[in-house]
Every structure is written in structure tokens, then in C-alpha cells.
A protein has these predicted regions:
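Beta1-alpha1 glycine-rich phosphate/pyrophosphate-binding loop at the start
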Residues: 2-84
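FAD-binding core/adjacent interface of flavoenzyme oxidoreductases
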Residues: 2-7, 69-158
Length: 158
């Protein structure tokens, strides 16, 4: 019996949950999460509290309830799941069942074969075409990077 290969594109919230569920359903599967950004399994509902200063440690947004940071090492050690951060999925070949990926920092490219593919890419905010939308300080709050930026702006204004 061959090992099932599962690729999950997206590492914010739904992707890691889907990967963990896949692990519970198949202890022998080769599971890989592909995440474009540097962070995994973020508690995005906590972004406003971090930006507002309710807590200062951004790692609280990516920690387990026991305080362990959910990084690639955590996913490998705790769940046997490979997590590729800073890696963008650039193309899907459904016929050959492969995902082409590129590391956004190094430019290194690789191809991941899959038997099952899970798309959990989340949402992309739409910035409406209104006057002033391109002014400095106008942003959205969707990612850890956005939360860090807003926190910095808040701190500079004090």
C-alpha cells in the first residue's frame, strides 16, 4: 500500500485545521502545508486585541493554549506535518497532480505531487475605489504583517 500524499495550500486557520484532521484520519499520509507568508495557524480574531494593546506578545496569536508557537517545527514534531512557510503555490497541474511552488525569499522552486489537494487560501480584501484609498495609513487588517504595521503606527502616534 502506497503512502497517500496530501497537499494543503493555505496556512492561516483552515489549512492547518484541515491538515490536522487529515492526519487524524490517516496516520501514514505524507501531509504538506504550503503557506505564502511566514506565520502559520494565526488566530486572526485576536488581531484587533494585539493592535489595541490588550497584549503585547504577537506570538500569542500563533500559540497553542499551552504557549507553544505553531511554527513548522511544531507541525512536524507534534503532528508529523511538513509546513513550508514563505512559499507560494504558483501553479496547479491537475492532470499530473502536482503543485508548483516558489520560496518567496530565495526564489527556489519545487514541485509537490499529491493524491489529495486541499485549497484553504482564505480571502483577499477588496479595497474599494474611493478617493483617498491610497493615502498613507489606509490599510486592511488581514494578516500578521498588517497587525504589526498597525501596531507600529499606533505606537508612533503616542
Amino acid at each position: 500500500m502506497s503512502t497517500k500524499r496530501i497537499v494543503v495550500i493555505g496556512g492561516s486557520a483552515a489549512g492547518p485545521k484541515a491538515a490536522a484532521k487529515a492526519r487524524r484520519m490517516d496516520q501514514h499520509a505524507e501531509i504538506t502545508i504550503v503557506q505564502k507568508g511566514p506565520d502559520l495557524s494565526m488566530a486572526s480574531c485576536g488581531y484587533p486585541y494585539y493592535v489595541g494593546g490588550t497584549f503585547d506578545d504577537r506570538n500569542q496569536l500563533i500559540c497553542t493554549p499551552t504557549g507553544v508557537v505553531r511554527d513548522p517545527m511544531f507541525f512536524m514534531n507534534a503532528k508529523g506535518i511538513t509546513a513550508l512557510t514563505n512559499t507560494a503555490a504558483t501553479a496547479l497541474d491537475r492532470q499530473n497532480r502536482t503543485v508548483s511552488c516558489r520560496n518567496v525569499e530565495t526564489g527556489e522552486e519545487q514541485s509537490l505531487a499529491y493524491d489529495k489537494l486541499i485549497l484553504a487560501t482564505g480571502a483577499t480584501p477588496l479595497m474599494p475605489p474611493v478617493p483617498g484609498i491610497d493615502l498613507e495609513g489606509i490599510t486592511n487588517l488581514q494578516s500578521m504583517r498588517d497587525a504589526d504595521y498597525l501596531r507600529k503606527v499606533r505606537d508612533e502616534k503616542r
